[in-house]
From Swiss-Prot:
Source organism (scientific name): Salmonella typhimurium (strain LT2 / SGSC1412 / ATCC 700720)
GO biological process: response to antibiotic
Pfam families: MarB (PF13999)
Matches recorded under InterPro entries: MarB (IPR025732)
UniProt entry keywords in alphabetical sequence: Antibiotic resistance
Record protein name field: Multiple antibiotic resistance protein MarB
Length: 71
């Protein structure tokens, strides 16, 4: 019993630390399925293919590459 008294404050400190860590001060935001995310008006669109469909990337890079479709 005498050995438990020195360890008791440490155990209480650890247990209270776990209790405080699980509590949040901010309310939890609920995800809503009815919300639509829209891009900002000033943002340019993300174009994954900036070169036209009929052209290839070698034209933009200046590398001589011959595509069979253009022959």
């Amino acid at each position: 019993m005498k050995m438990l008294f020195p360890a008791l404050p440490g155990l209480l400190l650890i247990a209270s630390g776990y209790g405080i860590a699980e509590q949040t001060l901010l309310p939890v935001a609920q995800n809503s399925r009815d919300v639509m995310l829209l891009p900002c008006v000033g943002d340019p669109p993300n174009d994954l293919h900036p070169v036209s469909v009929n052209s290839d990337k070698s034209d933009e890079l200046g590398v001589p590459y011959y595509n069979d479709q253009h022959l």
